[in-house]
């Protein structure tokens, strides 16, 4: 992210439109940009902007909204870079105001979710109104779009009690992933360990193990939706700042 402008297109692509989880934001390119050797993902409030997908009477949440009220970005290495095992490190400063749902995560390709596998190196959102940091993995079951989760949700106070200025600082999220386990860390504190002996897909994923196959990386800032909760417009524009993304692999 050292050169100002858009992230390196040889590595990163963008999601476009309303993507997942009935979130409030419309994803677009211009909300992710590199400045001062950092990647900034910015959520913004829009005024009077029409939803180009709008269809009156539609039951599809993506189409029944007449207006785009918020925009943000999701960048992904899908189709450009995938990784099997290694150490993943992301140094970032996350937004924590109402409605914020920033994430660092991975998905597999070649199968539908969740049989493709999902690793959430970091998520932040409110659970019953209380902020939490999450570290999770999900894989497939015998039912379509139904996942088996190994989740760890840590109350945000676990971090802010030790450092009241925690949210104003950069922190390092790390995943160590090898043939035996996925280990997820925040500032060298182990948050969750997922043995690969447990992560076997159900019948839809044909009993495969998604975490013995490559995954691609996603960085995004979502708003609201099923987990983000009520959006505090006083916190908009909202910025998620990423200093670096590093992946180390054994030769």
Positions of PLM-derived features:
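GH16 jelly-roll
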Residues: 2-251
């Amino acid at each position: 992210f050292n050169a100002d402008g858009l992230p390196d297109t040889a590595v990163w692509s963008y999601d476009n439109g309303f993507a997942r989880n009935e979130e409030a934001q419309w994803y677009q390119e211009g909300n992710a940009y590199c400045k001062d050797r950092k990647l900034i993902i910015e959520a913004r409030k829009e005024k009077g902007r029409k939803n180009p997908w709008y269809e009156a009477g539609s039951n599809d949440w993506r189409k029944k909204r007449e207006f785009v009220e918020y925009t943000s970005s999701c960048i992904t290495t899908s189709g450009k870079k995938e990784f099997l095992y290694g150490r993943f490190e992301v140094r970032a400063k996350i937004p924590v105001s109402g409605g914020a749902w920033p994430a660092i995560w991975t998905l597999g390709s070649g199968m539908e979710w969740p049989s493709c596998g999902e690793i959430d190196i970091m998520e932040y959102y409110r659970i019953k109104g209380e902020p939490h940091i999450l570290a999770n993995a999900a894989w497939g079951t015998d039912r379509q779009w139904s996942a088996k989760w190994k989740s760890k949700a840590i109350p945000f106070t676990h971090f802010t009690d030790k450092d009241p200025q925690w949210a104003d600082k950069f922190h390092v999220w790390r995943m160590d992933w090898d043939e035996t386990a996925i280990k997820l860390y925040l500032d060298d504190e182990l948050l969750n360990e997922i043995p690969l002996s447990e992560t076997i897909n159900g019948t839809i994923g044909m009993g495969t193990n998604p975490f013995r196959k490559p995954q691609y990386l996603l960085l995004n800032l979502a708003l609201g939706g099923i987990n983000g909760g009520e959006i505090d417009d006083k916190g908009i524009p909202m910025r998620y700042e990423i200093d670096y993304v590093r992946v180390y692999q054994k030769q």
